[in-house]
UniProtKB/Swiss-Prot annotation:
Protein name from the UniProt record: Endo-1,4-beta-xylanase A
Active site: 651 (proton donor), 706, 775 (nucleophile)
pH dependence: Optimum pH is 6.5 with sweet gum methylglucuronoxylan as substrate.
Protein's organism: Paenibacillus sp. (strain JDR-2)
Annotated Pfam families: CBM9_1, CBM_4_9, Glyco_hydro_10, SLH
Source superkingdom: Bacteria
Length: 1462
């Protein structure tokens, strides 16, 4: 027992001896309850006391008086004023605002002191302007005094305690022998389980023969919402409703209060003596808890406090007495609460004050207390190198074989708990000579539950000499009296020196948590569990307070990993993990198990061995599989149902796999993979499932867990793996899943695109498994510093994520943060969490707590993407800057992605009909490629999105091309290397890269836009220290094309008038293009703002004669009408006969505000008789459009298309010769996130706006493109229509929204779509005709089906479908329009409709992959096979379900897929 504790106990014993015997027990009980917040006996120094006024404070000994038996005291002398005193600051002694404490001060006045009459000691709460009296006691010479008072801290009026005197005693010196401050623990009532039956039966299960049904509109006292559980069909007392302890979270040995609100109907027959009973039961025991009388039309309440004893009962039952056994009743509400301490508790034994730490210099030629962490390192005091001024020695560290090996020093005796310390070590790398990362860290606690916070790290070389590592850490826990500091290296064999190690307090004392914050777990209690990753230090003191306040589930950071639980074969070490789990459960939280199978933090013996040459080789499959199964099953059985879920396998998938369709090839080549094979993941889950099958009462979910899951290639590979494993298992086990859930780790950074997170989340949800966000953190800033703008950005991303999670809450079980505060995070240098190192909320907390509010108040500034042009021309790829580059636009590569601003440069681009050419000139005098990672070498990268799709993930046309200064290349994906060429040249201060990229996914042409970026990687001493780009500042270009700039192809066909490009032959005003088309430049005249380009018959003939047929057999003529000054209207005048021709050619009018593709038969079968016609484009007026429509159109382009003949506008409508129009439009960044919602509205003469279903945004053209068979007014718009009942069909939401926005489909209500409802045959035909904009043959004598009335709302669409041969009906001339349509009939109708449009589906499709292929009717087999091969139909799991009724959601998806085929 320490001296302080002895003295405190003696005080209590002395007080007890003065109390009458009858009152002893209550006082003793009270003495056990308070928590000691601060206790000082001045045994060593002045403690936390500071001088007030002119007083002198001196620590003395030998001053024994009543209450101060050890004689140590603080002497307060040199007093001339009342305020010449001793102060104790609240912040220093751990007092928190709003909390109530009891202060007791024991003091004394010397026997020879002069004490005036009325002199008193005062205890006050003060600051510089306020003086709050608390207590007083008389001064008397040779006499002790006691000051005691309970008070509540209010930091707005006082900041410290002061022990002073009254005015009469202002000159009296005195002693303080002891100051004790305690707090009574407060209690709070936690809700453990609450069910109001608002949506279903909750956790209630049937007992006996009772029927349980969820009902509404049963309002009674205590059940205002009317939702209730109806318990009927009762004939026995036990025909009742049960609530299993395990299901509702009740734990053995804990005490709860249960309250049940019930009701009996007015017309119920209620025998005399009938009662409701609440019991705790199992199959053999029935423990009565409470009763209440049944009465017709009356509510009843059952309530009881009880303690769970699982040896005699396993569930609660709401039943009846014998007399009431036939009475049906309602349960409107069941509430179970637990009363727990919300603060206080048992105080740890007082620790001795921290000892002073003397800087360790090794000048005494000893190791200064340092030892090897593994015990195998060689630590030598040496004079080979030294850092100490005027010194000679340092400690040399050698013999390391693993990254965590290194010198370690115990420091717990130098720590005052709760204080922050600055730790410094000087290091010098010995070997290797190349760059190596050295890290200064601390260990808190021993064993599997320890924590290892990083304090500082630097990447250095041997040439750097001595380098300082320094960082701060607050020791809220002393780790069970085990604290160390150590130096390690990511290079497992690196050797180094250390010197001048210091460890000093910063003076920042214990901190409290913010009790006035909204607990995260409460905010999301109706959505998902909120979790955190913990070590042992998080289960005590202030950290435990924060953990319990905000979280209801935890994950062990290290304590349950394989190396912690089975370090050697058969030696299971559960002690630390057991202690952690027991503590977690005792504190009312749940536990998630992490992890059973992982390639890291697993002992080598599990899957490898040494061969005869001492090389590490894989174990044989059988032995490794036995080790895997034994570990999984032993661990799971040991912990049993103390956990709610397990990460069975962790991080098995490669990052960004190039072929995610082959998930087995995408797996990491881990030791488990090498020993067992690609099925090791499945084998692990099979072993885990066996344990659960043996213990059916355990409600435990089995998870696959992985990181970088926002990368779409990786997410697809994970999806394919889980789907394959689950589908095969389900087929053999009656639909049961093997893998219950996917853990999305969520280790993100401030530039993570949440759209990618959403794509992955919805992908995993579509598997039918639950999802957990398992290890969430978001890095921002560096070097332990977080600027305000980055803090806001970090919070904004957290807000975006939690908005996303809440939208998908039905499928998310828990969201777990990977750490509570920045200081203890494994990514501490980058400040990734919601709370700072002092446990105070950051902006990130507020982003999480109210995402919508935070995003509204902190909307980020949008930044336009860089734009540039690439000129037409073909350079020689030799690394030399030829003259052809001279007029190419220079793109500065100077947007930095990292704090350090290093190498920069410029880029230029050229193009021809096959390739893109890029020249990058880099200014950099120190070139380095020491790192084996290509991206950490001095290099350039070109990012290319050929279709300019701006997707947040890579499509087949996207690529990353990397070339270092020595012309060594790397690619992502690897397949894009084909046809790539590059050359480099170096000078003393720069290097040049010239490269050629084949344009394989697009046809290069003027005005074609490519997504494009250039990046320069600057390496120093084997590490990338700077990244500069032309456009992207996020660093996500390797997976996200939305961050690229835009490169527009230009200059083709200039005829040699420029210095860049290829000269093409031309005759007069006709230019022949390399692709075989011709460009005709007509004479243009502008009159009164009307620009008309006139094409004569001779002009057109000349252009057609020079044009060569394209791949489709048609000749192409481009009519180029350039911009004209002061022109508001543009027209192209053509010979009328040129548009009545059946010859195969196509005209494209390229004018200022539109591109119009005109078929040669545009005017066929029309009665236009003039010699010339003009196609005119003008900016349209919206005067006849209502205000709401005008507002929706906004400032987007609106054009009026018209056909003019003889000076008059004539109506044109030709369904057989559609015209294609492209309206240039630059969408906003927000619109580009959902380009499928950019479309065209047709505006008729009355101002009514109707969507054009075929319209869509073409990113490559930078225009909204549509086909029309009539001319009118058209407007570009962005329309987003959605419905509120799509949460359960995330796989269909994009399709439903896109089709609804185009007016193809409509909802069943204002905000409902009814996605699960079946769809009628007539309705599907109508949707099909509308989506594909099908037109009839023009005949009016088509006989309709006999069961279709002429006034049917779908009549016109069905008539079109019948005329076109799509709808053939049944043999009796009926169509059965109101019958539900089967999936196979849908497929037949769809293939017929596509055939009408001339869309050829691929032949030779096979249905062998589907288990129910034999169920497809003969008439439907070809259609089904064709749609499967085209990707329009994908089936559900391994089934086609051809005879199932088509749902509205499925119909929308099919329509969307065929719409995209157009």
């Amino acid at each position: 027992m320490s001296r302080s504790l002895k003295k405190f106990v003696s005080i209590l014993l002395a007080a007890a001896l003065l109390i009458p015997i009858g009152r002893l027990a209550p006082v003793a009980e009270a003495a056990e309850n308070p928590t000691i917040v601060y206790h000082e006996d001045f045994a060593i120094d002045k403690g936390k006391a500071i001088q007030s006024g002119g007083a002198s404070l001196t620590q003395v000994t030998g001053k024994v008086f009543d209450g101060n038996n050890d004689g140590s005291a603080l002497y307060v002398s040199n007093r001339a004023n009342t305020w010449d005193a001793a102060d104790f600051k609240f912040a220093d002694i751990g007092l928190q605002n709003g909390k109530t404490y009891t202060v007791t001060v024991k003091g004394y006045v010397d026997q020879d002191a002069t004490v005036p009459s009325g002199a008193q000691a005062f205890l006050q709460a003060v600051d510089s302007n306020n003086y709050g009296f608390l207590a007083s006691a008389n001064f008397a010479a040779g006499t002790a005094f006691t000051l005691t008072k309970e008070f509540t801290v209010d930091t707005s009026v006082s900041t410290q305690l002061r022990v002073q005197s009254s005015e009469e005693g202002k000159a009296v010196p005195f002693y303080i022998g002891d100051i004790l401050i305690t707090a009574n623990p407060t209690t709070t009532t936690n809700t453990v389980y609450h069910e109001d039956f608002a949506t279903d039966k909750g956790k209630a299960v049937q007992s006996g023969g009772a029927n349980l049904a969820q009902v509404a509109d049963k309002v009674f006292d205590g059940n205002d919402d009317g939702k209730a559980l109806y318990v009927s069909n009762r004939a026995n007392t036990w025909d009742a409703a049960d609530f299993k302890f395990a299901d509702i979270g009740l734990q053995n040995g804990k005490t709860y209060t249960v309250t049940v609100k019930g009701y009996v109907d007015q017309d119920a027959t209620v025998p005399s003596g009938a009662q409701a009973f609440l019991q705790a039961v199992d199959s053999n025991n029935y423990g009565f808890l409470a009763s209440a009388n049944f009465a017709a039309r009356s509510a009843f309440t059952l309530t009881k406090e009880f303690t769970v004893d699982t040896s005699v009962s396993t569930q609660l039952r709401v039943q009846s007495s014998e007399e009431g056994k036939a009475v049906p009743f309602y349960i409107g509400d069941i509430l179970i609460t637990e009363t727990v301490n919300s603060g206080g508790g048992q105080e740890d034994p007082p620790r001795p004050p921290a000892l002073p730490f003397n800087t360790i210099t090794f000048e005494d030629q000893t190791a200064g207390g340092f030892t090897g962490r593994a015990g195998t390192e060689t630590l030598t005091v040496t004079n080979e190198s030294n850092h100490t001024a005027d010194g000679s020695y340092s400690l040399k560290v050698e013999g390391r074989t693993t990254s965590w090996h290194g010198p370690s020093l115990r420091v717990e005796k130098y720590v005052d708990k709760g204080y922050e310390y600055k730790v410094t070590a000087w290091v010098k790398l010995l070997s290797p000579e190349t760059s190596t990362k050295l890290e200064l860290a601390s260990q808190v606690g021993d064993g599997g539950s320890a924590n290892y916070p990083s304090l500082a790290s630097k990447t250095i070389t041997a040439a750097d000499g001595w380098v300082q590592l320094q960082g701060n850490y607050r020791y809220n826990s002393v780790g069970g009296e085990y604290l160390t500091i150590y130096v390690q290296s990511s290079n497992a064999t690196a050797s180094y020196y250390i010197d001048d190690i210091s460890f000093e307090s910063t003076g920042s004392g214990p901190v409290g948590i913010q009790k006035d914050l909204a607990p995260l777990k409460d905010v999301y209690k109706n959505d998902f569990l909120i979790g955190n990753a913990i070590s042992a230090e998080d289960l005590e003191g202030t950290r435990l307070e924060l953990l319990k306040m905000h979280h209801d589930v935890v994950t062990a950071g290290n304590a349950m990993k394989p190396d912690a639980l089975q370090p050697t074969k058969g030696n299971f070490t559960f002690t630390a993990a057991d202690a952690m789990i027991d503590k977690v459960l005792a504190e009312g939280m749940k536990m998630h198990g992490h992890v059973l199978v992982w390639h890291q933090q697993s002992p080598a013996w599990l899957n490898t061995k040494k061969d005869d040459n001492n090389n590490t080789v894989p174990l044989g499959r059988d032995e490794a599989l036995d080790n895997l199964r034994t570990h999984i099953q032993t661990v799971m059985k040991h912990f049993g149902n103390k956990v709610i879920s397990w990460d069975v396998v962790n991080e098995a998938m490669n990052d960004n796999p190039s072929n995610p369709a082959d998930y087995k090839a995408s797996l990491r080549q881990t030791p488990w993979y090498q020993a067992i094979g690609s099925d090791y993941v499945e084998q692990a889950f099979l072993a885990a499932r066996e344990v659960l099958d043996e213990n059916p009462s355990w409600n435990i979910k089995l998870y696959y867990n992985d990181y970088n899951e926002d990368n779409q290639n990786k997410a697809t590979a994970i999806y394919n793996m889980v789907k394959d494993i689950n589908d095969r298992y389900a087929a053999a086990h009656n639909g049961k899943l093997l893998i219950d859930g996917v853990g999305m780790q969520g280790h993100y950074n401030i530039n993570t695109n949440p759209d990618n997170v959403k794509l992955s989340l919805e992908k995993f949800i579509s598997l039918g498994v639950e999802v957990s966000v398992s290890e969430l953190d978001v890095t921002a800033g560096n070097n332990y510093t977080l600027p305000e703008n980055l803090a806001v950005g970090q919070a904004y991303l957290y807000a975006q994520l939690f908005k996303l999670y809440k939208e998908h809450a039905d499928h998310i079980a828990r969201v777990t943060f990977w750490g509570m505060d920045d200081n203890t995070s494994w990514r501490a240098e980058n400040n990734p969490l919601l709370f700072d190192k002092n446990l105070q909320a950051k902006p990130a907390y507020y982003g999480v707590i109210d995402p919508d509010k935070y995003m509204e108040e902190h909307a980020p500034e949008s930044k336009d993407a860089n734009q540039a042009e690439a000129q037409y021309g073909t350079p020689v790829i030799d690394g030399t800057v030829d003259s052809i580059w001279s007029n190419a636009q220079a793109m500065p590569v100077n947007r930095y992605q990292m704090a350090w601003q290093g190498a920069t440069g410029t880029a230029k681009a050229l193009w021809d009909d096959q390739n893109l050419y890029v020249l990058i000139q880099v200014s950099d005098s120190q070139l380095n490629k020491a790192n084996e990672n290509a991206w950490e070498q001095d290099s350039v990268e070109v990012f290319l999105d050929q279709n300019n799709g701006k997707t947040t993930f890579y499509q087949n046309d996207d690529g990353q091309y990397r070339v270092n200064f020595d012309n060594e290349t790397s690619f992502s994906p690897a397949s894009i290397a084909a046809g790539f060429e590059s050359q480099t040249k170096k000078t003393a201060n720069s290097y040049t890269v010239e490269l050629k990229i084949p344009l394989t996914a697009v046809t290069p042409a003027n005005q074609k836009k490519l997504g494009f970026d250039v990046q320069i990687n600057d390496a120093t001493d084997g590490a990338r220290t700077s990244v500069a780009a032309w456009n992207d500042t996020t660093g996500n270009g390797y997976q996200d094309t939305s961050v690229y700039g835009e490169l527009t192809l230009a200059g083709k066909g200039t005829g040699g008038t420029g210095t860049v490009g290829t000269t093409v032959p031309q005759t007069g005003n006709v230019v022949k293009n390399p692709d075989g088309s011709t460009t005709l430049k007509p004479e243009v005249k502008t009159t009164n703002g009307n620009a008309v380009g006139t094409v004569t018959g001779d002009d057109l003939k000349k252009a057609l004669d020079q044009a060569a047929p394209a791949a489709g057999g048609k000749k192409q003529v481009i009519i180029d009408v350039p911009l004209q000054a002061n022109a508001a209207t543009y027209a192209v005048q053509l010979p009328t006969q040129s548009l009545k021709s059946q010859d195969g050619y196509q005209l494209t009018a390229k004018i200022a505000n539109a591109f119009i593709q005109i078929p040669s038969n545009m005017l066929a079968n029309t009665n236009v008789t003039t010699d010339q016609v003009s196609i005119r484009v003008a900016k349209a007026s919206l005067d006849n459009v209502d205000a709401a429509t005008r507002e929706l159109i906004g400032n987007r382009p609106v054009i009026d298309l018209s056909l003019v003949a003889g000076g008059n506008v004539i109506a044109w409508n030709n369904p057989t010769a559609p015209v294609t129009v492209a309206v240039p439009y630059a969408p906003t960044a927000e619109e580009l996130k959902h380009p499928e919602h950019i479309l065209i509205w047709y505006i008729d003469g009355s101002g009514k706006a109707t969507p054009v279903p075929n319209s869509r945004y073409d990113a490559a053209l930078g225009a909204v493109v549509f086909q029309t068979t009539h001319f009118s007014t058209y407007a570009a718009v962005s329309v987003f229509t959605t419905f509120g009942d799509l949460a359960k069909v995330p796989w269909a939401k994009e399709a439903i929204d896109a089709m609804a926005s185009r007016g193809v489909i409509k909802g069943t209500g204002e905000n409902t779509f009814s996605p699960a409802a079946s769809i009628k045959r007539a309705d599907f035909i109508a949707l099909l005709v509308r989506a594909l904009e099908l037109h009839g043959t023009g005949t009016t004598d088509t006989a309709m089906f006999s069961d279709v009335p002429a006034n049917a709302y779908y009549y016109n669409e069905l008539a079109v479908a019948k005329q076109l041969g799509i709808a053939t009906g049944f043999e009796d001339n009926t169509f059965k329009p109101d019958s539900s349509i089967s999936r196979q009939d849908m497929m037949v109708l769809t293939t017929r409709a596509l055939a009408v449009l001339g869309k050829q589906l691929p032949a030779g499709g096979s249905l062998n992959a589907f288990s129910d292929a034999a169920s497809v009717a003969g008439y439907a087999q070809d259609s089904v096979a064709a749609l499967v091969k085209a990707g329009v139909v994908q089936g559900s799991g391994s089934k086609l379900a051809p005879n199932d009724q088509l749902t509205r959601a499925e119909a929308a998806v099919i329509l969307y897929r065929i719409w995209k085929l157009q």
